[in-house]
Amino acid sequence: MSAVVPPVSRADRDPRAGHPPAADRHRSTVAVRAGIDRDSAFGAVTPPLVLSSNFSFAGFDRKRTYDYTRSGNPTRDLLAEALAELEGGCGGVVTATGMAAISLVLHALLQPGDRLVVPHDGYGGSWRLFNALAAKGAFELDTVDLTDPDALAGALARRPAVVWIETPSNPLLRITDLHAVIDATHAAGAIAVVDNTFLSPALQQPITFGADVVVHSTTKYINGHSDVVGGAVVARRPELHERLGWWANCLGITGAPFDSFMTLRGLRTLDARLRVHQENTLAITGLLDGHPVVRALHYPGLPDHPGHTIAARQQSGFGAMLSVEIDGGERAVRAFLDGLRCFTLAESLGGVESLVAHPATMTHAAMSPDARAAAGIGDGLLRLSVGIEHVSDLLDDLSDALQRAALAGSRVPGIPR
């Protein structure tokens, strides 16, 4: 790679330019066939795992395709290639974690004095990094409600370099209109970055709406088995891809070959897993919606969700994440969580197993109480990542949890809620 950092050209911000998604194969086929039957040395059907940290030169000043695994690795490149094709981008960079992917984008696209616009209700880990770097003077930071056109217009009037979009948002599942926000971002001369972790390219492809960069925590649905951490960044244009690749190598945050191999294996079942994930989620919303102990249910697949129409237009499915606000105070929340059999209390999401998290004390604990309140993340909010267990078992587990919460949340004389 060149020792000179490639510049970000204005052409990178042209929403009309892009790399179309694979037209000759369905995305599910692209995911299954990633790297299949491409081993010319031995004819291995699945791609071999290349663990070597370095690669020999053919002779003096005769570098082969690869020289050092931090800079490039055949196994990791197969994953990057597959993700780029699934997203409709020109190329991808695989990183060690999802947070490394976010860090990569910030390093590659921003410099001191630039302004970054981020959603007020996004992932707590992203929020922590944005604020930590802004406090060190890495860039100026604006936190706004991207679903509010007036708030967005005000932020864009301050001429940001990058607008960060997260849709659906984590954990409240708010929907941002990709077409409208990306068009407005480009009109302001800024680069549009979309975190697509909650849906994966199986259900949403932001580049088709003009996004310049798409970010993933591949730990989640792309791998789907809660046994690997990783991240990825996909670029719409070659100039951005080159810049991201340069910075990934420079920072040393590229993904490990074994992790890439495992993620490739998980990717092959992405479409099949998501079908069951979503079927189970739909059944669970039927149980939760209107239940006396449920103060609010956040799921874009519900017709009365504020973002339902937009989600139906820009997504090919509503996903398997939902959040629910439990009535009855901390006692009710504790009772709901205590005794769960099929939902494990844990951070992360997107695995085959069902998980439940309490954002205020877990995924979004880094946010100040005021920031959580502004985002609508209350102490009674629970986030569910619905797995692929038998739906009857999941429904029974949640039904019992709701009953416990209802009993615990009942007012008892002399005992505060």
Task: Label each region the model flagged.
Residues 1-14, 131-132, 140, 154, ...:
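PLP-dependent enzyme catalytic core of the Aspartate aminotransferase-like
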Residues 2-73, 79-82:
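N-terminal "arm"/small-domain region of PLP-dependent enzymes with the aminotransferase-like
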Residues 4-6, 18-21, 93-291, 413-416:
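Conserved PLP-enzyme active-site core in the AAT-like
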Residues 54-56, 235-240, 267, 326-331:
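Short loop segments at secondary-structure junctions
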Residues 64, 90, 229, 263, ...:
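Short amphipathic alpha-helical segments
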Residues 168, 197-199, 302, 327, ...:
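Active-site beta-loop-alpha junctions enriched in small/polar residues
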Residues 296-382, 386, 399, 417:
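Conserved C-terminal alpha-helix-loop-beta "cap" of PLP-dependent enzymes
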